[in-house]
Regions:
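Compact, glycine-rich, soluble single-domain proteins
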Residues: 1-77
Length: 77
């Protein structure tokens, strides 16, 4: 099942399937490590600051919550 990254909870893992953002945002997300096939772990969701923190490979990346709705993922069991 493919769903937006925003649905992932803290501690859950997923594989990036598709990014449905505009080209400039997609490029920025790609530079941050959000690429097709990458496995990531949700480390923190902070609704007050509207930030989400993910671990991708050995990197820890924070992105705006709005972008997590444009990254489609498949949960890992």
């Amino acid at each position: 099942v493919v769903e937006p990254l925003s649905g992932l909870g803290e501690g859950e893992m997923a594989e990036v399937v598709w990014i449905i953002s505009e080209a400039d945002v997609r490029e920025m997300l790609g530079r941050s490590g959000f690429l097709y096939g990458e496995v990531l772990t949700c480390l923190l969701k902070n609704p007050v600051r509207q930030l989400c923190v993910y671990k991708i490979r050995r990197r820890v990346v924070a992105i705006r919550e709005e972008y997590t709705k444009e990254i489609l993922v498949r949960r890992m069991l």
